[in-house]
């Protein structure tokens, strides 16, 4: 099961890399960039995600070089499969840049990481994915976070809520890869 979780994370890292290449190609004519649509991609310490404002942030502020550098350093731990260090780095990143351009992606990756660290922290994963949906409803990571929320609720034994999220992904993001993952998960588990 652990290896399957790690393989799933590797697929998301690869997908993020491809999205980042597309974003970079699109942004080549826009040096300033607005930060919208960015899709970069032991035991971990527990935390909660309650110190972020509760209002939707559909368009985060543009990233400054220090923020981008801190985000890339944290993401580097994901790529090198040092998941506990990645959790720490993303927590620190969000402490410094809670409303930054990369904040939605940091929450997404914390959600992913809390599912693969040992021991897994599904409630913290749920909190980060839900925060992404609530505060950044237009972010490119929303379909993936919604799919992951379906899986987290399934792991926690809440099949009804799981199905709601998975069906919502299929209904609202039918052309997105997360919709096919949701269909597959429903076929295998319901």
Locate predicted features.
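Acidic, proline-/serine-/threonine-rich low-complexity intrinsically disordered segments
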Residues: 1-80
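Structural motif corresponding to the intra-repeat A-B loop/turn of tetratricopeptide repeats
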Residues: 80, 117-119, 156
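Short solvent-exposed coil/turn linkers within tandem alpha-helical repeat scaffolds
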Residues: 96-102, 134-141, 156, 171-180
